[in-house]
Regions:
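Conserved N-terminal segment of class I S-adenosyl-L-methionine
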Residues: 1-124, 133-137, 210-211, 219-223, ...
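S-adenosyl-L-methionine-dependent methyltransferase catalytic module, highlighting the catalytic core
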Residues: 6-7, 131-140, 149-259
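Surface-exposed loop/turn positions
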Residues: 63, 147-148
Length: 268
């Protein structure tokens, strides 16, 4: 694939999965205090409540739920209002202020000792930041009760937005390309490679769908209201076309945990 200012990019010819040169990127994958408040302020100021509502409908009544990589806890806060029957927990590298009805844990889900299992685990825009995708999905599988569900969301590298960004790079306009393949995204999943990752980790695919983020949530790295409005209008058109063609920017999978005898040690 093309060269990024911060790393080299590669693509698997079999599963179409794109990924960064992981060793070279390891030093970049650090999250400063301004990750939520400055660098991606719009994304976190405009939560995807339409997606939250769709996910909430997929969670069984009375379920215990873990949000893996919960960030500021926006999804869990949504559930406290709309699904008060659920038992809610969240884990993230960053600390969170206490909220009634939510138990927050601070740490790396791959290393933190969690001595219980859950009926549903949700993980939104996290897997693309994890170097060991297989280990992450298997860790989620280990923390789910038999027959429980995992709901994961990530970018869709097969989307129209990604395609235009790659075309722009080859035409000498790399702004969108450099943004989408940023240093914080180690993996770039197509729909095929995302499904494959969950199947390999012990999940059958219940459903999957593509969708767009809220237009107001897009971080557009330009100065000036006119330039911002033009690019945001272009994104709106892309998202509308993506909805019709099935090539929208985000993808979500609902998977059900199935038995994996080779991974039984330490699982629920």
């Amino acid at each position: 694939m093309a060269h990024h200012p911060e790393t080299d990019l590669y693509r698997c010819k079999q599963c179409t999965h794109a990924f960064s040169h992981l060793e070279a990127m390891r030093e970049f994958e650090q999250y400063e205090d301004n990750y939520f408040d400055v660098e991606h302020r719009r994304w976190f100021d405009h939560p995807n409540t339409a997606l939250f509502a769709r996910i909430a409908k997929a969670i069984p009544p009375g379920a215990s739920v873990l949000d893996a990589g919960c960030g500021r806890g926006d999804f869990l806060r949504y559930l406290t209002e709309h699904r008060p029957d659920l038992r809610l927990s969240g884990i993230d590298l960053s600390s969170n202020q206490s909220v009634d009805g939510i138990r927050f844990l601070q740490g790396d889900i791959m290393q933190t000792g969690i001595h219980e299992c859950f009926d549903a685990i949700v993980s939104l825009t996290v897997i693309e930041h994890i170097s060991d995708v297989t280990g992450f999905v298997q860790r989620i599988h280990d923390l789910i009760n038999p027959g429980g569900i995992a709901i994961m969301m990530t970018n869709n590298e097969g989307s129209l937005l990604y395609s235009l960004a790659r075309a722009g790079y080859h035409l000498g306009v790399p702004l969108a390309f450099n943004r989408l393949y940023s240093r914080h995204h180690l993996h770039h999943f197509t729909r095929e490679s995302f499904r494959m990752a969950l199947r390999r980790g012990g999940f059958s695919i219940e459903s999957d769908f593509v969708h767009a983020p809220p237009l107001a949530a897009i971080d557009i790295p330009v100065q000036g209201k006119i330039a911002d409005a033009v690019l945001r209008g272009g994104a709106w058109i892309l998202f509308k076309v993506g909805a019709v063609t099935g090539r929208n920017h985000l993808q979500t999978i609902v998977g059900r945990a199935v038995a994996l005898p080779q991974f039984d040690v330490g699982s629920c």
